[in-house]
Amino acid sequence: MRLFSSKVNSSAQIKDCSTWYPQPGQHISIRTFRELNQVPTSKNTSTKMESQSNGDNSKSTADLQEEVSSLPTTHTQRH
């Protein structure tokens, strides 16, 4: 089991993010992890980033709504 744990653990840890811990020789930043999370929720992050930069949630959402309404009718076909 010692040979089993030493080799399989290294590969299994990479596959499982929950049980994966950075080793002393590896350098992992939290930014890369956040970037990976931003990909599926790009719509939510873009709205949050705008609200943080502007400081007004109502303004950013209103601007987004205006942009959506100004888009061509191909966007409204989804509704």
Swiss-Prot record:
Keywords: Host-virus interaction, Inhibition of host innate immune response by virus, Suppressor of RNA silencing, Viral immunoevasion. The keyword Repressor does not apply. InterPro entries: Gemini_C4. Residues 1-79 are annotated as: Disordered. The keyword Lipid biosynthesis does not apply. One of its GO terms (biological process) is symbiont-mediated suppression of host innate immune response. Pfam families: Gemini_C4. Belongs to the geminiviridae protein AC4/C4 family. This is Protein AC4.
